[in-house]
């Protein structure tokens, strides 16, 4: 029989204890846990170093309230890792005559990069995308083609550059110069593309805010799939989707959802007739819409965390390019049908148009005021009114000025008497000593200086009265300007109408629909839903 040779690894395996025979740790959870793998221990102690990178660059994680409320035990040494010898003071003295170790001297030397001026070294890091990598023949490409830039280093540099850029606009003068530079850059003619030098512009058009449609709030609605009906396609489907409406609804259990309504055949004919006759709607007609789909929604607006500004452009031939704001972003996902819950597949939306009420017109004027500046004519009228008020109040100021002069003369008399008393005190202090003389003289000078600079109590009261009058005049001018702007808003009423409405009053998922849904809607129509 041939001898059996046992290696060192086999010997060690034979003496190892069987690790998977140990009993698992008893869990403190009553229910059965599907994944019972315990987390590993932290390999090192906390370092208390600020993390300069964005925490959401790899994955967006939101901690729960249970994690936020948990307090981790921080176990540290009593001396915090710093051992101090309080008995022998010579422990921390450094001998200047001691020579460093050669290894330490190399660590203190500055790294000098060798110049890479040779042509061969410049070609090492060159990457040719259209050429096949010869991995089986040579590893030269793999050795020289690897980039030396690490992502952490690149991100750190970008963070540092971001901090330096933010410091540029801290000063007021730098902000003014930066704003003026934008006007100068806008005057320069565009001769070529900013990144493609061979691309030249065919037509240059100015970009302005959309003053016509800015009064209507717009929302971006994103569907998870094509909402077009299955039985139609092409131009007919696009025509139906252009006339579609979305409304917030509630099922029997009280769960809210978004209903997607498409126009019926009769409504499509009425809309086509309105378009041919160049009118928005017929006042007495009723437009019917049938429910097509049900969605759950997720809304983000300006009040939501992580909101990003979004704009869209409108090209008008012969006029220019205009941009408008998308202040709400809505994501719609298909709603699953629940067993035992009656679906609203037979719901019918009946729409009848009306004129806008005062509240809706005020909301439009408020949005319009975001873009428009005050007209110079109104400013001149305000200035004339303020001048008339100042002229009318000048007589009262003169009377108050004469009374303040009388009070000032009385204050001067009292000041002279106080000076005499101070002189008597100075004579008495001369007898007491030289140090007391100097202190009393300083106090007398301080009192006189205070009276000359700040005046008496009567003067301060007159100043307070005059300040109150100035504030009253300023308030009056503000009220006049507000009334003038309101009148202008009523004169410039807009009869434009939008066919979209928003049932999304808040930024959270499945938020409760309240009266704010009508305020957020830009539609000038009344909608009633009936279920068969």
From Swiss-Prot:
Matches recorded under InterPro entries: RNA_pol_II-assoc_Paf1
Main location: nucleus
Covalent link Glycyl lysine isopeptide (Lys-Gly) (interchain with G-Cter in SUMO2), residues: 133, 154
GO MF term list: chromatin binding; RNA polymerase II complex binding
Any one GO biological process: positive regulation of cell cycle G1/S phase transition
Biased composition (Low complexity): 499-508
Residues recorded with modification Phosphoserine: 117, 456
Region annotated Disordered, chain positions: 1-23, 361-532
Stretches assigned to coiled coil: 352-401
Gene Ontology CC terms, in alphabetical order: Cdc73/Paf1 complex; cytoplasm; fibrillar center; membrane
Residue spans of biased composition, Acidic residues class: 375-388, 458-469
UniProt keywords, alphabetically: Coiled coil, Isopeptide bond, Nucleus, Phosphoprotein, Transcription, Transcription regulation, Ubl conjugation, Wnt signaling pathway
Subcellular location: Nucleus
Biased composition (Basic and acidic residues): 361-374, 389-434, 442-453
Function of the protein: Component of the PAF1 complex (PAF1C) which has multiple functions during transcription by RNA polymerase II and is implicated in regulation of development and maintenance of embryonic stem cell pluripotency. PAF1C associates with RNA polymerase II through interaction with POLR2A CTD non-phosphorylated and 'Ser-2'- and 'Ser-5'-phosphorylated forms and is involved in transcriptional elongation, acting both independently and synergistically with TCEA1 and in cooperation with the DSIF complex and HTATSF1. PAF1C is required for transcription of Hox and Wnt target genes.
UniProt family annotation: Belongs to the PAF1 family.
Self-association and partners: Component of the PAF1 complex, which consists of CDC73, PAF1, LEO1, CTR9, RTF1 and SKIC8. The PAF1 complex interacts with PHF5A. Interacts with POLR2A, TCEA1, SKIC3, KMT2A/MLL1, SUPT5H, RNF20 and RNF40. Interacts with UBE2E1.
The name this protein goes by in its record: RNA polymerase II-associated factor 1 homolog
Lineage, opening ranks: Eukaryota, Metazoa, Chordata, Craniata, Vertebrata
